[in-house]
């Protein structure tokens, strides 16, 4: 009793306590302390006794019961109350001859007459029994389980409905579709009357309802609700397009269609009638990152075949850049030109889809006039149409600048741009039927045809009164809105500055294209910087690509970037008239020409003056050498006045760079004046081409640039500089598997070439071949300084900077790589400064004997990246040269003070009698250190100016280094890079060399030029020098170059039979090559890969060994030399420093002996003890010494030699183990027999190294 209470009273121990045990049987459920009941053990006993008493009482009692037999016979019987029910059954069956197993008893109560439940052992007396029924048992038939039910096979059927929703139902694949159609309808919540089961929603194949899923072989179908989806289709377009306009086009504040019926009055055919057409969205939303366009049901028909155009225009078919479209989309334009004819009503089945397409299409309606009258007024507010044109032309520069960044191939202009672009092109599905749609299909799809969508500057190209064509477009009246939009666009440009710096570096030009196109570089300047109204000058134009073989009209240039219009004949005539004052200066020196061109037009800062200079020089004088500097300097002057902000600096820098390129392109055109006038008059009205004629490459849009590039129609091969990575941190591995530093190939220093005064005729084919083989470089940095710093150091078409040389050179068309060499982004200089002009291109001819026609080299393009380094080199500043450096060659660049020391360069004569007059110009780096000079490979074996006098001088032009002139933004790329290329690629490393005029006759070594290799002992192998590399080597400050970054690239000899001459420079070494310029003695005969030279062997000094006592001791210990290797130093050395004993005597004889034995040092360290044997040994030794008089002194000398100052190197292990130390020391090989060996051993014992430590002991008798 108390135990459960005690356990319950215990505090919890953290575990749940067990429940109480149930009370013992026979005890009441509730326990009361004061109850009168007995204890539990007594209660159990009492209950059993009560049961016994009850049985005895029942035995004594009898019961009168009525028994009903199975036959229905009732029978009265008296039963004993103590009988169990089972016993009663057995007795009754026995009495009635029945089987007890087949019968059962049923007892009914006397009061209720209901059957009573009982157990077989229940006593009859305990039951209130009145009647007992003896019934026969009914045999219960067991329900046998049937065969197992096989589950019905079912599959999951995917039901697509309402175009975008899905449901999954499990149905039988064996039943017909009409049986499962109710299940599908219930799942999709559609009415079966309107549902049509289709195989898919694209093909629309209707399924037969009588077939099952297995017969059709499908597990997915489309339930088309023809009632709901017809309505949904018609309303789908509006919702989606409205969302897209809110999401993307709302940023540009696109006008509604009602008030932006823009018209483009461009002629569709050679006829003079202008036709208005509506421009669609100029840029598909899909081409903007982050905006996805659903072009699900939008398809367009193919454009009609291109119309036949003039043959000249077929040759230079035009192409529009994506940039012209992004600007159209960014600028909201309303052009009040007459609205275009309305399209026919769309089909009733899809009523709203076409309108939606047109809603998207209407977003950037821009009026692009062809006629004149689009001037930029002096107050800076341009007329409306002018700005529209500026928008187009500026935009077109974006794409052409960027498009070749990563793509190796360019698609046709149909892939690139139609004013309704590829993703949005489906919007015009129902618009092509009308007459206007023919025009839009030609001009929108192939928008190269949009000719004079010109900037205000470009329109003034035509003539004095800005008359380009007879058509005039209606000008809009909302000038204020245009100004506002232009301001917003400049803001957008400001935000894109960072993108500009990264994206503008990847422009590449085609090498083998045939083009006579000219870019109207629209002035992307703020309105206040626009050109005054009265300016009649044209803008510099950019030609990229090869010159056509037949004369092309310089006035009539095909519009390749959708921004340059055709010139009519009177425009050309007036332009030529305006050129008259400039042509008188052709023979003037370079500096004079550069400064007089701006002086002629002091009031007008129009960049266009350069184009007139270029055109006049071509048509009148045919002089290719003259005009580029003037145009470039004038363009730079224009922009020095116009710069107001950093964004403008960047934009104009790009613009100037490409104007420079444009000018050179114009210079390269061999134009006949008469042909110009004739063709101009004939072709001016028809300078529109269809898209199909232009197989050019695709260009992606780029932001922030303001000049245009003519895209050559096709490219033979697209080659990349394997050394230059598009990602800054990429790991680059050259052909030999060497890791190339990713920072070593950024901006290159251009090797500036000078030309010999007499220039011989060089076929243009060789020029093209050389450039095609020689350049694959791509510029990665921002176009830093103009290529005006100097032409590339190319062996064949040498460009000179001397006016005399330029005038003497015959005008030859220059192949596109050379021209693109001058495509340096010219960043504007400070206010009031003149930028150094771009040098004209002269051809210094090489005799045919020295030229090798290499016809198997891969044609490759030359890009502007090869001239980036030239610009940097010019602005870096004068190098810091050590006093011992000899600078015998070339001209040095002008310092900041404008001084121009002119040095005579003795041309170096090479083995093959070729003479070159290199003018080396060392380029200083920011820290004053010399940077790498890589001499270019000359794949053709062509060399410079054989006709030059052997010791002739060529005086370089006076150039200003404008490091402080340039904005700080230009200095962001600060490393020169060596160009790595395989032998096959023929990279012109000369473009990357910072020394002007070095003409290389060697080929680029296959090993990466930018891989730093340091000679083992700090000694660089002298680099081989050809005639051109000697000039470079003498310019070196310390005789070896420092590769960009942290290594000296030195090329091991025998690199694939080709060599790249990389002059190593190190600050810590004295000038190794500074005084010696005659290192071309080992030049091998030239091959197609250029002359080969042997490297001089590198002489290495052995590393001086450490002679300290500790090192000697440790060496002896490690080599098991024992005590004979240890030496005792004098008390006072020659320097007066006290020296410690390097050996401490062992304490006892035993320890010394054991140490000697363990150290394998032989008997040299054993002590001499007095004994008869020792005396006998001494006598033997004396006799032997007297007999060998001549040998003994020698051995004595050997034994008595003083210890060496430097411990000898440890002996080989075999020698140390096989021979005693003494024998090895005294050269046992010289002893002939064992007697000599024994004598030598005894001598060593007595007078060897251990003789000093031997001590006398008293004689033991």
UniProtKB/Swiss-Prot annotation:
Pro residues bias (residue ranges): 336-349, 1204-1214
A GO molecular-function descriptor: actin monomer binding
Record flagged with keyword Cell inner membrane: no
Gene3D superfamilies named in the record: Phosphatidylinositol 3-kinase Catalytic Subunit, Chain A, domain 1
Membrane-spanning segments: none
One Pfam family linked to the record: WH2
Localization (cell): Cell membrane; Cytoplasm, Cytoskeleton; Cell projection, Ruffle; Cytoplasm
Xref: InterPro entries: COBL-like, Cordon-bleu_ubiquitin_domain, WH2_dom
Keywords (A to Z) from UniProt: Actin-binding, Cell membrane, Cell projection, Cytoplasm, Cytoskeleton, Membrane, Phosphoprotein, Repeat
Region span, Disordered: 1-46, 259-480, 500-534, 580-600, 658-699, 779-843, 907-1104, 1120-1145, 1196-1232
Record PTM Phosphothreonine, positions in chain: 447
Topological category with respect to the lipid bilayer: Peripheral membrane protein
Motif, KKRRAP 1: chain positions: 298-303
Annotated ranges, domain WH2: 1109-1129, 1149-1169, 1237-1257
Subunit structure: Identified in a complex composed of ACTA1, COBL, GSN AND TMSB4X. Interacts (via WH2 domains) with actin monomers. Interacts with both PACSIN1 and DBNL. Identified in a complex composed of COBL, PACSIN1 and WASL. Interacts with PACSIN1, PACSIN2 and PACSIN3.
Chain's role: Plays an important role in the reorganization of the actin cytoskeleton. Regulates neuron morphogenesis and increases branching of axons and dendrites. Regulates dendrite branching in Purkinje cells. Binds to and sequesters actin monomers (G actin). Nucleates actin polymerization by assembling three actin monomers in cross-filament orientation and thereby promotes growth of actin filaments at the barbed end. Can also mediate actin depolymerization at barbed ends and severing of actin filaments. Promotes formation of cell ruffles.
UniProt protein name: Protein cordon-bleu
Annotated organism of origin: Homo sapiens (Human)
Classification lineage: Eukaryota, Metazoa, Chordata, Craniata, Vertebrata
């Amino acid at each position: 009793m108390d135990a459960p209470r005690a356990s319950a009273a215990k505090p919890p121990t953290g575990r749940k306590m067990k429940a109480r045990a149930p009370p013992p049987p026979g005890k009441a459920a509730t326990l009361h302390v004061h109850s009168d009941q007995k204890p539990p053990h007594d209660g159990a006993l009492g209950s059993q006794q009560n049961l016994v008493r009850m049985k005895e009482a029942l035995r004594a009692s009898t019961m009168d019961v009525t028994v009903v037999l199975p036959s229905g016979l009732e029978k009265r019987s008296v039963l004993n109350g103590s009988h169990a029910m089972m016993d009663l059954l057995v007795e009754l069956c026995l009495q009635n001859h029945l089987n007890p197993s087949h019968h059962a008893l049923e007892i009914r109560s006397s009061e209720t007459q209901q059957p009573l439940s009982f157990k077989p052992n229940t006593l009859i007396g305990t039951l209130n029994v009145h009647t007992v029924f003896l019934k026969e048992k009914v045999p219960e038939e067991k329900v046998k389980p049937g065969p197992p039910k096989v589950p019905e096979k079912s599959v999951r059927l995917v039901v697509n409905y309402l175009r975008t929703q899905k449901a999954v139902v499990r149905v039988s694949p064996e039943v017909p579709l009409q049986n499962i159609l109710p299940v599908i309808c219930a799942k999709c919540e559609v009415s079966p009357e309107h549902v049509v089961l289709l195989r898919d929603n694209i093909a629309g194949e209707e399924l037969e309802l009588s077939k099952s899923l297995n017969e059709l072989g499908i597990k997915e179908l489309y339930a088309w609700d023809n009632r709901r989806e017809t309505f949904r289709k018609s309303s789908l377009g509006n919702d989606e397009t409205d969302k897209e306009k809110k999401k993307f086009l709302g940023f540009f504040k696109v006008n509604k269609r009602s008030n932006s019926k823009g018209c483009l009055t461009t002629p569709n055919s050679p006829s003079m009638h202008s036709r208005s057409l509506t421009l669609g969205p100029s840029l598909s939303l899909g081409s903007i990152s982050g905006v996805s366009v659903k072009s699900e049901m939008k398809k367009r028909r193919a454009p009609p075949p291109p119309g036949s155009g003039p043959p000249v225009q077929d040759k230079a078919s035009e192409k529009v850049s994506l940039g012209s479209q992004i600007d159209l989309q960014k600028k909201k334009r309303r052009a009040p030109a007459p609205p275009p004819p309305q399209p026919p009503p769309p089909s009733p089945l899809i009523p709203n889809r076409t309108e939606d397409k047109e809603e998207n299409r209407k977003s950037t309606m821009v009026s692009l006039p062809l006629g004149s009258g689009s001037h930029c007024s002096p107050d800076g507010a341009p007329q409306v149409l002018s700005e529209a044109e500026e928008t187009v032309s500026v935009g077109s520069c974006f794409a052409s600048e960027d498009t070749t960044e990563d793509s190796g191939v360019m698609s046709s202009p149909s892939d690139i741009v139609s004013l309704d672009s590829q993703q949005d092109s489906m919007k015009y599905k129902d618009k092509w039927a009308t007459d206007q749609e023919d025009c839009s299909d030609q001009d929108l799809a192939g928008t190269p045809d949009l000719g004079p969508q010109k900037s205000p500057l470009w329109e003034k190209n035509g003539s004095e009164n800005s008359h380009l064509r007879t058509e005039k477009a209606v000008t809009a009246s909302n000038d204020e809105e245009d100004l506002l939009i232009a301001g917003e666009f400049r803001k957008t440009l400001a935000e894109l500055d960072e993108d500009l710096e990264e994206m503008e570096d990847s422009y590449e030009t085609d090498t083998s294209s045939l083009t006579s196109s000219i870019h109207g570089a629209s002035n992307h300047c703020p309105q206040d910087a626009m050109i005054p109204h009265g300016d009649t000058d044209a803008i510099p134009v950019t030609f990229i690509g090869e010159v056509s073989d037949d004369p092309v009209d310089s006035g009539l240039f095909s519009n390749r970037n959708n921004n340059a219009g055709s010139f009519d004949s009177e425009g050309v005539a007036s332009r030529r008239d305006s050129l008259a004052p400039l042509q008188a200066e052709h023979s003037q020196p370079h500096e004079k020409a550069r400064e007089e061109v701006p002086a002629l037009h002091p009031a007008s800062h129009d960049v266009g003056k350069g184009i007139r200079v270029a055109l006049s020089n071509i048509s009148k004088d045919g002089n290719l050498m003259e005009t580029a500097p003037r145009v470039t300097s004038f363009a730079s002057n224009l922009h020095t006045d116009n710069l107001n902000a950093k964004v403008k600096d960047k934009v104009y820098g790009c613009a100037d760079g490409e104007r420079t390129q444009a000018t050179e392109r114009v210079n390269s055109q061999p134009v006949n004046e008469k042909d110009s006038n004739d063709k101009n008059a004939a072709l001016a009205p028809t300078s529109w081409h269809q898209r199909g004629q232009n197989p050019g490459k695709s260009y992606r849009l780029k932001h922030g640039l303001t000049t245009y590039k003519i895209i050559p129609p096709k490219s033979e091969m697209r080659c990349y500089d394997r050394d230059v990575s598009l990602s800054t941190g990429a790991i680059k591995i050259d052909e030999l598997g060497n890791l190339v530093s990713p920072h070593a190939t950024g901006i290159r220093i251009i090797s500036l070439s000078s030309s010999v005064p007499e220039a011989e005729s060089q076929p243009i084919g060789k020029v093209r071949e050389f450039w095609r083989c020689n350049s694959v470089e791509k510029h990665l940095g921002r176009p830093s300084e103009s290529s005006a710093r100097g032409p590339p150091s190319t062996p064949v078409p040498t460009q000179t900077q001397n006016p005399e040389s330029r005038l003497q050179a015959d005008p030859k068309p220059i192949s596109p790589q050379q021209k693109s060499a001058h495509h340096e982004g010219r960043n504007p200089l400070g206010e009031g400064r003149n930028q150094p002009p771009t040098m004209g291109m002269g051809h210094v001819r090489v005799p045919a004997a020295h030229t090798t026609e290499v016809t198997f080299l891969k044609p490759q393009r030359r890009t502007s990246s090869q001239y980036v380094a030239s610009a940097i080199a010019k602005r870096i500043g004068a190098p810091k040269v050590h006093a011992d450096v000899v600078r015998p060659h070339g001209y040095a660049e002008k310092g900041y003070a404008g001084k121009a020391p002119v040095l005579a360069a003795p041309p170096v004569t090479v083995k093959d009698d070729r003479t070159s007059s290199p003018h080396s110009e060392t380029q200083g780096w920011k820290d004053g250190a010399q940077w790498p000079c890589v001499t270019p490979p000359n794949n053709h074996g062509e060399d410079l100016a054989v006709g030059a006098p052997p010791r002739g001088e060529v005086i370089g032009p006076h150039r200003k280094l404008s490091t402080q002139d340039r904005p700080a933004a230009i200095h962001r790329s600060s490393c020169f890079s060596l160009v790595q290329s395989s032998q096959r690629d023929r990279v012109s490393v000369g473009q990357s060399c910072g020394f002007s005029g070095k003409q290389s006759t060697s080929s680029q070594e296959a090993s990466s030029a930018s891989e730093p290799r340091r000679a083992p002992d700090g000694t660089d192998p002298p680099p081989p020098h050809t005639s051109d590399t000697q000039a470079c080597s003498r310019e070196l400050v310390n005789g070896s170059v420092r590769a960009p970054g942290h290594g000296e690239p030195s090329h091991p000899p025998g690199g694939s039979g080709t060599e790249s001459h990389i002059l190593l420079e190190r600050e810590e070494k004295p000038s190794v090559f500074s005084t010696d310029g005659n290192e071309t003695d080992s030049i091998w005969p030239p091959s197609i890969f250029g002359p080969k030279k042997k490297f001089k062997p590198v002489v290495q000094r052995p590393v001086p060994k450490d002679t300290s006592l500790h090192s000697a001791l440790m060496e002896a210990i490690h080599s098991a030399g024992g005590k004979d290797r240890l030496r005792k130093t004098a008390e006072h050395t020659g320097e007066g420093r006290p020296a410690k004993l390097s050996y401490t005597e062992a304490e006892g004889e035993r320890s010394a002996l054991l140490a000697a034995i363990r150290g394998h040092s032989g008997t040299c360290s054993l002590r001499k003890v007095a004994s008869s044997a020792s005396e006998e040994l001494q006598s033997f030794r004396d006799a032997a010494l007297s007999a060998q008089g001549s040998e003994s002194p020698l051995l004595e000398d050997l034994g008595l030699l003083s210890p060496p100052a430097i411990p000898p190197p440890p002996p080989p292990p075999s020698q140390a183990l096989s021979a005693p130390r003494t024998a090895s020391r005294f050269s046992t090989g010289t002893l002939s027999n064992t007697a000599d060996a024994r004598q030598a051993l005894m001598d060593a014992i007595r007078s060897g190294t251990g003789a000093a430590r031997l001590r006398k002991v008293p004689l033991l008798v």
